[in-house]
Design a protein with these regions (language model features):
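An alpha-helical support segment within catalytic cores of ATP-dependent transferases
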Residues: 1-27, 37-39
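Conserved catalytic-loop position in the HRD/HxD motif
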Residues: 28, 46
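Active-site activation/catalytic loop segments of kinase-like enzymes and analogous catalytic loops
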Residues: 56-94, 111-126
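ATP/Mg2+ or Mg2+-diphosphate-binding catalytic cores
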Residues: 115-153
Length: 153
């Protein structure tokens, strides 16, 4: 695999997000971990990755509509659409600065990057091969290129 490229990508990504405000972070706040009861109450599950982190990371994961195994150009637009619907209610309770808002796309990339490490940690290095890792790096490059207009113009 293109290990050096993964390392460089990860370091660059980290440089973009490392100075974001820190606070409580669930760490796995995708819609599968949010359940609505018949009486309309919401419950958040799966706290094994909660930590001191970037609260904006949870917001990015809630709004993330990309597909891990294959890049789909509509993932950007769908994620942005969910963010635009979710953000007004969120902002009634939590203030975001512009740096946090601009980190949205980088945090989705960070989640994608982290999922690879989680899969290998859980199932061992034999569960992926070089072609799979190269495809994941390609996904990250495509995502970065597509989102560059939004955050780095």
């Amino acid at each position: 695999p293109k290990t050096d490229e993964f390392f460089t990508y990860g370091e660059t990504l980290w440089d973009h997000v490392k100075d974001l405000p820190h606070g409580y972070c669930h760490g796995d706040m995708y819609d599968g971990n949010i359940h609505k009861t018949p009486d309309g109450k919401f419950y958040v599950l799966d706290f094994d990755t909660s930590c001191e982190g970037f609260p904006m990371y949870d917001l990015a994961l809630i709004c993330n509509k990309t597909h891990y195994f294959g890049f789909n150009e509509s993932g950007d637009g769908k994620s942005k659409e969910v963010l635009s619907r979710f953000l007004p209610g969120y902002m009634k309770h939590i203030t975001l600065n512009q740096t946090e808002a601009n980190a949205f796309y980088d945090l989705i990339a960070l989640y994608h990057f982290a999922l690879q490490a989680t899969i290998i940690e859980m199932y061992g290095p034999h569960c992926v091969d070089n072609a799979f890792l190269d495809e994941q790096l390609d996904w990250l490059y495509k995502w970065w290129a597509q989102c560059a207009k939004e955050t780095r113009t």
